């Protein structure tokens, strides 16, 4: 327990990703790589958000498989379980318990305005369930249980984090200083990777076009094929130049190449001067293949060691539950529940 108390003195950061599909190159370069580089700086909590996944119908066996695959990929990407708390959301019941309480302090109008609810409802019109509507209240519980200083946020989650901050203000206004106000964490570095087939939209594991996303566990030949087919630009220039406004396809490929090689945009422009897209696209593919090779091999090895994987998620849930329970007890006392 002493180690747990010591860890709490560091600034706390928390994030979760739904195991609704394989992790993408965008997830790695935009978030996970950055998290791994900051494991000494913060007390980090990273979880597989399996409870959020079931707001959309899931195949149970596939969800279990993807949850463990995602955990293995987290570790293979450099999130050391000795330095980070890695756990499965459904293994920490306090998430659901605090989620219910926060539902009662979240206004119907606030939830109605969430753009993600509108988007997902449009895509899943046959299954507009209550969980989809109250998803942001559970997300607020995910965050507030661990009293984090920072929450890494993507563009698609900014609105939910703002709602979380509104809930903190409302709850603390009634009951005093219960929750710490979380700040959005926007890293100084971290590539924003766009779809290879539509460079105006973010690379996503839910992309309907399979050629738009690169997955961490993908075969090298498939990665190379996708990069060769990647959208460049319809200009007649056929030169590698960083111009996000007029050449978004090339700019996206340059962003990826820069992120995996460490080269600046100027260096990339010089390297491919006079060579055109025909030479550039396979070079980006080769660089990505070599970056992902050790991750894929390590994730495969970890998945084969079921005892190790189980020890990681059990230890993670134990530590997460210890911290979460302290917050939940405080909340239950404030709202008037009899202590158990």
Regions found by a protein language model. Give the residues of each.
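Internal, conserved structured core segments that host functional sites
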Residues: 119-171, 175, 195
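Conserved nucleotide- and phosphate/pyrophosphate-binding catalytic cores
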Residues: 159, 165-340
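Short helix-capping/linker segments at secondary-structure and domain boundaries
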Residues: 108-112, 145-152, 258-268, 296
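N-terminal Rossmann-like or analogous alpha/beta NTP/dinucleotide-binding catalytic cores
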Residues: 2-141, 287, 300
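Short alpha-helical patches at coil-to-helix transitions and adjacent helical residues
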Residues: 28, 95, 157-161, 250
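A generic secondary-structure signal for well-formed alpha-helical elements
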Residues: 71, 78, 106-109, 148, ...
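Short, solvent-exposed beta-strand edge segments and adjacent coil->beta transition regions
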Residues: 14, 20, 148, 209-211
């Amino acid at each position: 327990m002493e180690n747990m108390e010591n860890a709490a003195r560091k600034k706390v950061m928390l994030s979760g990703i739904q195991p609704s599909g394989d992790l993408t190159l965008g997830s790695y370069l935009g978030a996970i790589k950055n998290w791994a580089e900051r494991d000494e700086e913060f007390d980090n909590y990273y979880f597989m958000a399996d409870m959020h996944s079931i707001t959309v119908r899931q195949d149970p066996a596939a969800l279990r498989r993807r949850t463990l695959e995602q955990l293995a990929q987290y570790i293979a990407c450099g999130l050391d379980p000795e330095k980070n708390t890695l756990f499965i959301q459904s293994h920490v019941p306090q998430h659901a318990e605090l989620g219910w309480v926060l539902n009662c302090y979240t206004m119907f109008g606030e939830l109605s305005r969430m753009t993600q609810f509108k988007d997902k409802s449009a895509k899943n019109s046959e299954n507009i369930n209550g969980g989809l509507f109250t998803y942001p209240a559970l997300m607020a519980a995910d965050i507030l249980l661990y009293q984090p200083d920072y929450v890494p946020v993507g563009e698609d989650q900014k609105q939910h984090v703002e709602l979380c901050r509104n809930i903190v203000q409302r709850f603390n206004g009634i009951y005093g200083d219960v929750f710490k106000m979380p700040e959005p964490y926007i890293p100084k570095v971290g590539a924003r990777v766009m779809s290879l087939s539509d460079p105006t939209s973010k690379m996503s594991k839910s992309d309907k076009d399979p050629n738009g996303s690169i997955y961490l566990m993908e075969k090298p030949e498939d990665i190379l094929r996708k990069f060769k087919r990647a959208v460049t630009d319809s200009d007649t220039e056929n030169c590698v130049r960083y111009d996000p406004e007029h050449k978004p396809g090339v700019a996206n490929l340059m962003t990826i190449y820069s992120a995996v090689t460490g080269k600046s945009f100027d260096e990339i422009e010089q390297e491919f001067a006079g060579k055109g897209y025909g030479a550039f696209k396979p070079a980006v593919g080769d660089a990505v293949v070599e970056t992902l090779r050790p991750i894929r091999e390590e994730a495969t090895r970890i998945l084969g060691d079921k005892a190790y994987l189980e020890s990681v998620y059990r230890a993670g849930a134990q530590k997460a539950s210890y911290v979460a329970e302290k917050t939940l007890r405080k909340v239950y006392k404030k709202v008037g529940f009899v202590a158990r």
